[in-house]
């Protein structure tokens, strides 16, 4: 039986935006198992210089990531879409175990199977050291980014 993860391709502006917000909310949960279920069992990723294949490697990667990137908060924004592909830009804030804060900026290219599961994720990311006073993502970590929180564009990022 095929797993379905609506919305399904081909995407419209509305359904692509729903997919982006769903991915943001999933990643902000910092739950590797939950996040991995949005991807095909054989999903292929390039994240920075790391190559990842399949859900078990996704879970291992995200587990390592969120042990290092503490108080993680992410905002994604739709950049472009066509057919079964979506391009997003994103920024996330986090600190390391020494209390050093960062804002990481990036772009992702996503390709989806007809099931709505992501089959390919290609990400380029750069880290910028910031001070705690420079932080812009301050919502309560117990839930997703509030609907009325400014977008990346609204924040000038």
Walk through the language-model features, giving the residues of each.
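Short helix-capping and hinge/turn segments at secondary-structure transitions, especially at repeat
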Residues: 28-29, 40, 44, 63, ...
């Amino acid at each position: 039986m095929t797993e379905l993860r609506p919305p399904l391709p081909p995407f419209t502006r509305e359904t692509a935006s729903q997919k982006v917000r769903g991915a943001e909310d999933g990643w902000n949960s910092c739950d590797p198992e939950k996040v991995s279920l949005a991807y095909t069992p054989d999903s292929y990723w390039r994240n920075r210089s790391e190559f990842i294949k399949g859900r078990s490697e996704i879970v291992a990667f995200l587990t390592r990531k969120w042990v290092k990137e503490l108080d993680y908060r992410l905002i994604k924004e739709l950049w472009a879409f066509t057919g079964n592909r979506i391009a997003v830009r994103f920024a996330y804030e986090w600190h390391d175990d020494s209390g050093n804060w960062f804002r990481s900026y990036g772009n992702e290219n996503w390709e989806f199977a007809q099931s709505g599961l992501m089959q390919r994720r290609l990400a380029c990311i750069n880290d910028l050291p910031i001070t705690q006073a420079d932080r812009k993502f301050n919502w309560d970590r117990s839930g997703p980014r509030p609907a009325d929180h400014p977008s990346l564009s609204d924040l000038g990022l």
